[in-house]
Amino acid sequence: NTIFTNVAINNDDMTAWWEGLDKNPPENATDWKGNKVNGKEYTAAGNKLAHPNSRFTAPAQNCPCISPEFNNPQGVPISAIIFGGRRAATTPLVYQSFSWQHGTYVGSAVSSETTAAATGAVGVLRHDPMAMKPFCGYHMADYWAHWLDMGKKLGDKAPKIFNVNWFKQDENGNFMWPGFGDNMRVLDWIIKRCEGTIDAEKTPIGYLPKKGDINLKGIEDEVTSEVEDKLLAVDRDLWKKEVEEMRSEERRVGK
């Protein structure tokens, strides 16, 4: 009950295969384009059996920790909306917008270094408003206006808006945040902000965690006090450049 896309097929047992699954590509294979090839020879020659953006989807009910409210026809309250881009510098690990309007701007300013999941060259910075650029079916400025209109209708019931960046790097190009399951530590801070049980540091870009407010128990050797400072740093010079870049991008979108 799983759907795979852009993967290779092992024709002997009709199972999916992709680079990274294991180091044994099937000999009797069909690549992601539908070509029947010898997988071992094909990959040895430098070719890829699967597309770099191969995916799978499975029923949500397969998740062992799914909420009992998942299928509630009345819906559930949304407390937080979380945007995120892939940035090596500039953007801190997490920050909260000042308001819904500011949060809409934060979402519109999302940008990422391109990966295999996006068309084009890898590592090039591209604007990706709300991470919706490949999926937005109408003019992006109208999409932003829709968000602002939603805020007017929601009033004080509007969710709080946050931005995360798991990909900040140190001066040697190494990721400073461990990611994966440790991202729950940031979500824990976000939940506490929504509950109003924790304060935050007001900065020019939004509200940031106060030092020590993100639970780093168990990863102190990896995320040291110095690393924590770097993860939450707001470099004003970099952000001035970011503002100018966004002004240029908004002028482009507005044409």
Predicted segment positions?
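Glycine-rich, often acidic-flanked micro-motifs
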Residues: 1-227, 238
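Charged, heptad-repeat coiled-coil alpha-helices that serve as long linker/dimerization "arms"
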Residues: 226-230, 241-248
